Each structure stands twice: as C-alpha cells, then as structure tokens.
Design a protein with these regions (language model features):
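Beta-strand-rich binding/interaction modules
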Residues: 40-79, 89, 511-530, 555-559, ...
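Single conserved hydrophobic/aromatic residue that forms the stacking wall/gate
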Residues: 1-7, 12
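Short, hydrophobic beta-strand segments
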Residues: 91-100, 545-550, 643-661
Length: 686
C-alpha cells in the first residue's frame, strides 16, 4: 500500500545537550535585529541561563559577535543568581557597517556566548544569525531591508529521495542548492516544521522559508494522523518551532496549517486565530498565514457551489472525487483549474468560507485560488495575498499576476522537487489508465520541476525563463516513444518532454519540439539547416513550437530580441552507450556524498533513450557503505537500498555514507553494467 506521503515515523536526528554549573538553555538564545541601515545595525541578544548549584552565585556572561571569524562587537554581563534559579540576559549591541542578509547576499554573523564561574568556563553556545528586517503592506508587498522581494517559491516535502526520510546536512544542502540554481528564492515546508539542517542550508544559500506547523487540526485526513493528538500537542509544537526558527534569517512566514478540513467553520476560525496569536506572542518579527483551499473551506457549502459550477459548465456536480482523505481531495481538485477554477474561486460562498480564517492571518494564503487575487484586494484592501500552492503548468499566468499586483507577494508551486508518495499525480498514462490512482508499482508524485535525484526537468527551465532570470533558450522534445498518442493528465502536469535529440529507431517520425525563450523570436536549426524563425517571448507564452522529422545530428535554437542574439542552446544525438560517467555533486561533506552516474557514448554525450537503459551494479569498499541507490523513475519495483538499479533517462544516483566520519580513509565506489561498462571514484572524506 502506498502511503499518501513518506515519513510517518521519527526521521530527524536528535542530540543530547550538556552543560555545567551555569548553562545556557538550549534554543533560548535569541538574536533580533532592532534596526539597520548602511552605517549601523542594532541587535538584541537574549539568553536564558540556569544556575544548577544549590546556592546563590555571581557569574560572568561574555557575548561576542563575529563575522568570518573576526570579532565585530562584544559585551560582558555580570549575572547574579539565587539557588537553582533561571536568569535572563538581554543586551542591545550596535554593529557598525553591517553586512545585511538577503536572498541575493546571504551574509551571516555568529553570536558566541560564554558563561564563567570562578574563572572557569561553564558553558558555551554559538548561533548563526543574519541582520535583516521585514516589512509588509499591500502597496510595497514584502520588503527585506527596504527592498521589495517577490517570492519565487516552491513547496517541498521532507523526504530525501533515494535515502528516504533520513535527514543529513549534505542531503538538505544538495536539494537547497539545486532549487536556488533553478531560480527559486523561497521554500514552503509542506506540511511539517522544517529540519534544522534545511534551515541552515537556506540561511547560507539564500532561500526564504515559510515554515508550516501541520497538515491537519482536529479533523482527520487519514486514519491515525496528527488530528488524534492536535489538541494536546499544538502548543508544544509551536513553542519548539519558534525556538528552532528564531535565529534563522531565512524564516519569514509561519503557516498555521495546510488545507485544513474545518477552516471554513466557526471552530476552525477560532483555532486559526488562536494559533496565529500564539505565534505572534512568541515571535512578533515574522508573519503568519494559512494555506487555505476553497474545497476544504467550503464544507457544507460545496454542494451549492458545485451545482453552480455544473450549471455554468455542464459537468457532473459531484466532481470526480471518490472515497476520502488526501487523494480524494486531490482528484476533485483537478477540476478546479482553467475557467472552472476561476469561477469557483470567485464564488460568493467561497468568499464566505474563507473570510474569518484569512482575516486573522497577516497574509491571505490561497491554494489553487489564483482567480481570487484581484477580488481579495477589493474585499480586503489592507491585506497581502500569497499563492501558497499552485499548479506548475500555470506559472506563466501566475507570475503575471505576481508582477502585476503589488499586494500579491509571490507564488509557491506544487512542487519544485519530486517526492515519494501521492503516486501517479504526475505520471503520463497512454493506456487509458487514470492518473492519481496509484497503479502498481507507482511510487512518486512525479510533478517536481526537479526530479528525485536532482535533475532539472523542462518545466524548470521554462519557469526560469518566465521568472526573467535567463535569456538563454531551451529545447524540449516530446518523447517519440509516444508520438501520435494522447496521454491522460492532471492539472499538475506540464508536458511529457525531455531535452534530448537521441531517438534511435524513430528516424522520419515527426517530433514535437518546443523552444522556450524570453526573446521575441527564435530560430531552430537541424544539422545547421534553418527550420525558420518563429515568435516567442511573453506575447507567445515564451514558447515557439516546431514539428521536426527526426534525423540524427544536432538541433540548435537561437534566441533573438529585435534581431539581437540573446543566446543559443544545442542538442546532439548520442551514439550507443559505451561508458559510464560519474560526478561527485555534493561538497564539504561530513556524513554522506552524492555521486551522479550517467550513460554516455564515446564522446561523453549523455544517452537518455529508454531503449539504451542499463542495469547498474554498485559496490563500496573502504570507509563507506552504500546508503541509497536509485533513479528518478516514478514507477518501479526496484528499491533504493539494493546494490542494483536500472537507469532512467540515462542517469542514476548513488549515496555513500562514511562508516567513520573522523577517519581520513576514503571510500571507493565502483559502478558497472553487465555489458562491460565500468567506472570507479575515490571519495575523500572532507
């Protein structure tokens, strides 16, 4: 049975913290930016200290602020304790010519605190922090240090692909870097508090964070979910979440929930306001939202709304949902796109359902309700709006809304990185089977801009162009194995295409080729012969489409803006696979290393054709073990903990874990195929 999402048990590493006579309470060190300009920043350092000795004493607390190892400011406090008493230290420290933190320049400082008693060090604590201030209004949107920032966001789940739900620093940094390289500047942690390792990665790399409390409150979505203990646990979870997040400059928004079943009820409105108030009580430097879904919020109103939708568009008023839980909702939601989605989003009963929950949040968070963005401003002109979850293929229209309306502060796509669970939502079926029905052996959502092992898919490059981050064009070819066939699709799906011009056996077959470009024109060349110029750019949905009879060789696209060349992109046909190429894609590792493996020909050109797939075998000797081995294949019986895997789209990923992280002995990974290809890589422990 495929669970809705992976990771139902404990999957985040824990630590034991120790301290002596006067210790610094864990997660009770807080650094707050009070003010900042180019000349001066003022921060407040707050720490809770505990005397565990059975008598009173006077201790010393030294606070040092460092940047790149150099001390920039300091302060010393004398602290008097009574027996076994907790005492708080609060001090304001000026920092001259501060380096401000932002996604573009994620400058970090270190706050070092040392407690001493009888001239002996009792405890030490270090926390990274960033100097930055936030502002929010419907005229300027979201501002960081006075500069308006639009959130180019993605939702991500917490699994790390071929190593499952394990949390390693290296795994989180790898995902974070790939997302930043793809043009994202924000992550929504769906639907759980983000790991410390991912928060650290976001701080250093420059990714903004919406951290999310939970996927449900009192009403269950699936049997034995968090709703069973929500009333008993939410207060403690919020406390832990704020303590965990407070010193991370990347965290800017707390989400109190996702698609909450009771959000449109009086009880839901009460819980929502209570949760938002609790977050603000603990942290008044950040903003709150709730990822509201019109279908959930509608509740008993839904029948009346769907009746009106059915009358308007001539469809079944019961939709396509069956059963219950998350999958039924997602199946129903596939109807909520296009014109039907616009009509649904603006329905007066949807407005009524959203009213109370959205009003008690700082930011109105909307899932799949982009049709309400303009209406929300008419109804609540003092509020800002955020697309907390949206369809990937709608990015062109969604980003136009973000750019057009100042009160719309960003967009979070579902999803930027593929994940285990919700099997089938993005898998293309050409045999008449329905999507999102978890047909064995489907296991992945397969709707990530980036696939499970970190490869960017065509929609990722399309999105980067829509964002306005690159002038370089990109070529995507619909898979010729399915030429002339029609696939079933959900609203989350883009196109079944790949950036490849290797289609052995399909010579003469017409290929549907898209060239994505910000330029007003593109020109496509097949083996240096022009296939003509076509319009592209914003006015043509950033896409020029060609029908090209396949022949081996080169396929090159050149982008122009008013006849000025912007950039070019070229594909070459790969010959038969003769080699394996490996590359270490993580850096500064302490626990694990990621090794990407590609099938290539004699010239090093990657061969991603299905007909050329190979069964790979792997072994590790020396100071290492094979922690995970797999591909981005969304439907496979192979597991990630075997030493053999079949390539998918010409690649695979091996994750090696060191047996002894303190040892300098390397691990050696060997990968080979049954037809004689072999490669080895020596993995040094950094």
């Amino acid at each position: 049975i495929m669970p809705s999402l992976v990771g139902s048990e404990m999957c985040i590493r824990d630590s034991l913290w120790t301290g002596k006579d006067v210790y610094i309470s864990h997660d009770k060190l807080r650094i707050t930016t009070l003010s900042v300009n180019d000349d001066m920043a003022v921060i407040e350092v707050y720490a809770q200290l505990k005397n565990i000795i059975g008598h009173g004493l006077e201790a010393e607390c030294l606070i040092e602020i460092k940047k790149d190892g150099q001390k920039t400011a300091s302060d010393t406090q004398r602290v008097v304790f009574r027996s076994e008493q907790m005492q708080a230290v609060r001090v304001q420290i000026p920092i001259e010519h501060p380096k401000k933190w932002s996604p573009k320049q994620p400058a970090l400082y270190e706050c070092h605190i040392t407690t001493k008693f009888d001239d002996k060090i009792c405890d030490e604590a270090v926390s990274n922090f960033g100097i930055r201030v936030l502002a929010l209004d419907p005229v300027h949107g979201l501002q960081i240090n006075g500069e308006t920032v639009k959130l180019r966001g993605t939702c991500i789940h917490h699994d790390n692909g071929v190593i499952g739900a394990e949390t390693f620093k290296e795994a989180e940094w790898y995902r974070c870097k790939r997302l930043k390289e793809a043009g994202f500047n924000a992550i929504r942690s769906a639907h759980h508090p983000m790991s410390r390792a991912m928060l650290d990665a976001c701080d250093h790399i420059g990714i903004l964070v919406m951290d999310e409390l939970t996927d449900m409150w009192d009403k269950e979505k699936n049997t034995y979910d968090f709703s069973d203990i929500f009333e008993d646990e939410y207060n403690q979870w919020i406390n832990h979440m704020v303590e965990k997040d407070y010193n991370h400059p990347s965290v800017i928004i707390y989400s109190v929930g996702n698609e909450i079943q009771e959000a449109g009820t009086k009880q839901g409105a009460w819980i929502n306001r209570m949760l938002c108030n609790k977050f603000h009580e603990l942290d008044n430097t950040r903003y709150t939202t709730n990822a509201l879904n019109g279908l959930n919020c509608a509740g008993r109103r839904l029948g009346f709304i769907m009746r009106d939708v059915a009358e308007k568009f001539g469809m079944d008023s019961h939709g396509s949902g069956s059963g219950g839980g998350s999958n039924a909702l997602n199946s129903f939601m596939s109807l909520m796109s296009g014109e039907k989605g616009e009509f649904f989003a603006k329905h007066p009963l949807v407005s009524e359902a959203l009213e109370e929950c959205s009003q008690s949040c700082d930011i109105t968070g909307l899932n799949y309700l982009s049709g309400r963005y303009e209406l929300e401003h008419e109804l609540h002109p003092a509020k800002t709006v955020l697309g907390t979850e949206t369809y990937p293929a709608d990015i062109e229209n969604l980003w136009k809304l973000v750019e057009t309306y100042p009160h719309v502060i960003g967009d979070f796509t579902w999803t930027g990185y593929d994940y285990i669970g919700e099997a089938g939502v993005g898998i293309f079926h050409y045999d008449g089977n329905a999507n999102f029905t978890s047909i064995y052996p489907e296991r992945l959502g397969y709707i990530g801009d980036i696939d499970l092992i970190g490869n960017r898919r065509p929609i990722s490059y399309f999105r980067e162009i829509v964002y306005g981050l690159t002038d370089k064009p990109y070529i995507a070819v619909e898979r010729l194995e399915h030429a002339g066939q029609t696939a079933g699709k959900t609203a989350w799906m883009f196109k079944d295409n790949i950036s490849s011009w290797t289609w052995k056996g399909f010579e003469g077959t017409t290929a549907n080729v898209d060239v994505y470009s910000s330029g007003d024109e593109v020109e496509l060349f097949l083996n240096d012969k022009s296939l003509g110029r076509k319009p592209a750019g914003r006015e043509n949905h950033f896409t020029a489409s060609y029908e090209v009879p396949y022949e081996p060789g080169t396929l090159k696209a050149v982008a122009y803006q008013k006849d000025r060349k912007l950039g070019e992109y070229e594909l070459s046909t790969a010959k038969s696979v003769t080699k394996l190429k490996v590359c270490r894609v993580t850096e500064n590792e302490r626990n694990i290393a990621y090794i990407k493996i590609w099938l290539v020909d004699d010239n090093g050109t990657i061969n991603s054709q299905e007909a050329e797939k190979r069964l790979l075998h792997a072994s590790v000797v020396g100071n290492g073990v094979l922690e995970g081995f797999g591909t981005a294949n969304p439907s496979s019986e192979e597991d990630y903990f075997s030493d053999s895997v079949t390539t998918f789209d010409g690649s695979a990923l091996a994750v090696v874990r060191w047996k002894d992280v303190k040892s300098k002995e390397p691990a050696v990974l060997k990968v080979w195929t049954d037809d004689g290809c072999q490669v080895m890589i020596n993995i040094e422990n950094n």
